[in-house]
């Protein structure tokens, strides 16, 4: 029986490698998401200055595990920020920051689409087609009473 338990556990350990390479996105300078840029504000309009509205930021990436670091805070206003990724998976909940205070938080996000290999695809239900975890983008949602983020 022990033989059968070790095989699945070993497989899980091997599949948990994070992607290599680092890219920083400054949100003050970020465009609206487009296929040409491959990153930017997505799903709703980019937030106006001193906005209290939630916003989404997407980056086109291949399937895999990604180590994401967000720098929460703003030079202009205090905030309370919650961060979710893909299909509303909660990673950071209600982190308060004072004006000109910055807090970095890091987490691992797994990003997948429906393509497996060659001609193999995951079959999804019609209601799942609108979900954020079945596209070619890693999408982060910034929410809270006053969501503030300087960079990703």
Where are these regions (language model features)?
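Sec-dependent N-terminal signal peptides
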Residues: 4-13
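Compositionally biased, intrinsically disordered or flexible polar/acidic segments
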Residues: 18-152
């Amino acid at each position: 029986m022990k033989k059968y338990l070790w095989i699945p556990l070993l497989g899980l350990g091997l599949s948990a490698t994070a992607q290599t390479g680092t890219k920083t996105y400054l949100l003050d300078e970020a465009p609206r998401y487009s296929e040409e840029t491959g990153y930017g504000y997505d799903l709703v309009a980019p937030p106006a200055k001193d906005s209290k509205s939630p916003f989404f930021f997407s980056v086109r990436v291949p399937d895999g595990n990604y180590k994401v670091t967000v720098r929460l805070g703003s030079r202009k206003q205090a905030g309370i920020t919650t961060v979710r990724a893909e299909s509303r998976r909660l990673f950071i909940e209600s982190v308060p920051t004072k004006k000109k205070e910055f807090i970095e938080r890091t987490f691992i996000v797994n990003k997948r689409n429906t393509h497996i290999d060659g001609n193999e695809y995951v079959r999804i239900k019609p209601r799942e087609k609108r979900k954020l975890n079945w596209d070619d983008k890693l999408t982060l949602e910034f929410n809270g009473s006053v969501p503030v983020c300087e960079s990703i």
